[in-house]
């Protein structure tokens, strides 16, 4: 073999090696691409959503008809993601709930699911669809597909001063939803700014029915408080003073607290604890008169009220008044004047004695809301059946497995 032939063989060998390396690289790239595609497919199948503030991933095992966008909310027992329903290109919210670790979460989920299916109202959040599990064995999480609302009243109050027009419209829509709920014999029991969802059109929808109950007879109220964890700042005084009977007036009180917060930009009664909460209320409303005092059925609660120093009522017009020389706007969130009609409605919403508090129907007729009030466009709802909340009456006997079966049955029913 001469040198030329040797070089020729070497060149051929090198070319073969280069070809093999190129093939190997191409195979590796193809393999990596396949892995990436598989990972992307898995991510799409699981609809994994990651918050910008956190590196953790939350898997959403939903139909590939939905493209998950981002996490928009996180609560005590659920995570909400925005998504696009691909066939219709509609933006939706998907709420993922994993309730099966605690019976209380199962109960809350069951209440919410049943009530949202019952109501069909413009100012109550609705369920568009439910992701149904393949079978009972694979039923470990719940996915509710709902209307997407951009924000909530809590966020809005924190970031801007609301105009009087906005306040009127938000209170009107809240009361309009309450009229439907109360006509169905349902108490929400947890109304607060973060449970009032809003979109860019200023449409308002009440959400979170996990603490809701039927307007029950006195004996059915036994155990009413056992799970009462509603935000203290919006709780009616009769709840803390253990009145024998709870009525629609507890929701009306919460509306009053929300109205006051919109007017001032901050909570009206931000109690540190049970005692401080009552004291803050009495500092504004004054010590109850004899009639209201004896309306409190609990002797222990009456004795507690009696032990507190006497308070004189402060009219809301005085509480929210700005000084003319602009040295203080602390009670009005920078607002230069407040509509006197708003304060008049507030006086009627925040009355200590629930029997004297304005009703939702009368609040809707109040002059402050006359721009929006239309009795022909404030629908009522069908009353819930008597056995609607039967599971609540038996909750001490129901295991998590029992509640899981009830939830599965509810989810598998048509909407």
Curated annotation (Swiss-Prot):
Segments carrying motif TXY: 226-228
Binding site for ATP: 72-80, 95
SUPFAM superfamilies named among the record's database cross-references: beta-sandwich domain of Sec23/24, Protein kinase-like (PK-like)
Domain of life: Eukaryota
Keyword Cell cycle listed: yes
Catalyzed reactions per annotation: L-seryl-[protein] + ATP = O-phospho-L-seryl-[protein] + ADP + H(+); L-threonyl-[protein] + ATP = O-phospho-L-threonyl-[protein] + ADP + H(+)
GO BP annotation list: cell division; filamentous growth
Annotated control of activity: Activated by tyrosine and threonine phosphorylation.
Cofactor requirement: Mg(2+)
Family listed: Belongs to the protein kinase superfamily. CMGC Ser/Thr protein kinase family. MAP kinase subfamily.
Protein name (Swiss-Prot/TrEMBL): Extracellular signal-regulated kinase 1
Species this chain originates from: Candida albicans (strain WO-1)
Underlying gene: CEK1
């Amino acid at each position: 073999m001469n040198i030329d032939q040797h070089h020729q063989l070497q060149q051929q060998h090198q070319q073969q090696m280069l070809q093999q390396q190129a093939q190997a690289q191409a195979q590796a790239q193809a393999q990596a691409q396949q892995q990436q595609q598989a990972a992307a497919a898995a991510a799409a199948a699981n609809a994994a959503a990651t918050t910008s503030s956190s590196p953790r991933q939350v898997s959403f095992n939903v139909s590939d008809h939905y493209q998950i966008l981002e996490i928009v909310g996180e609560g005590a027992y659920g995570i909400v993601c925005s998504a696009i329903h691909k066939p219709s290109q509609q933006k939706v919210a998907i709420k993922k709930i994993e309730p099966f670790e605690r019976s209380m979460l199962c109960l809350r989920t069951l209440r919410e699911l049943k009530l949202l299916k019952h109501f069909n109202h413009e100012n109550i959040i609705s369920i568009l669809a439910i992701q149904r599990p393949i079978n009972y064995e694979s039923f470990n999480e719940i996915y509710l597909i709902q209307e997407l609302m951009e924000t909530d009243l809590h966020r809005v109050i924190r970031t801007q001063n609301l105009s009087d027009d906005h306040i009127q419209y938000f209170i009107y829509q809240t009361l309009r939803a309450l009229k439907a709920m109360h006509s169905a014999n349902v108490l929400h029991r947890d109304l607060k700014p973060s449970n009032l969802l809003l979109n860019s059109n200023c449409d308002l929808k009440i959400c979170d029915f996990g603490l809701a109950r039927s307007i029950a007879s006195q004996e059915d109220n036994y155990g009413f408080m056992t799970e009462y964890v509603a935000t203290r700042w919006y709780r009616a005084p009769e709840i803390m003073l253990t009145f024998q009977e709870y009525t629609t007036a507890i929701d009306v009180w919460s509306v009053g607290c929300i109205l006051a917060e919109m007017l001032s930009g901050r909570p009206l009664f931000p109690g540190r604890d049970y005692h401080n909460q009552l004291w803050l209320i009495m500092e504004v409303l004054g010590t109850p008169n004899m009639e209201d005092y004896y309306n409190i059925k609990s002797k222990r609660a009456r004795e507690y009220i009696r032990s507190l120093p006497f308070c004189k009522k402060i009219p809301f017009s005085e509480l929210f008044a700005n000084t003319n020389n602009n040295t203080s706007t602390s009670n009005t969130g920078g607002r230069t004047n407040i509509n006197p009609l708003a304060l008049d409605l507030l006086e009627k919403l925040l009355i200590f004695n629930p029997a004297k508090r304005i009703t939702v129907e009368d609040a809707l007729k109040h002059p402050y809301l006359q721009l929006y009030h239309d009795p022909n466009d404030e629908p009522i709802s069908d009353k819930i059946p008597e056995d609607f909340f039967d599971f609540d009456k038996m909750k001490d006997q129901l295991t998590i497995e029992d509640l899981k079966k009830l939830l599965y049955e509810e989810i598998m029913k048509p909407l």
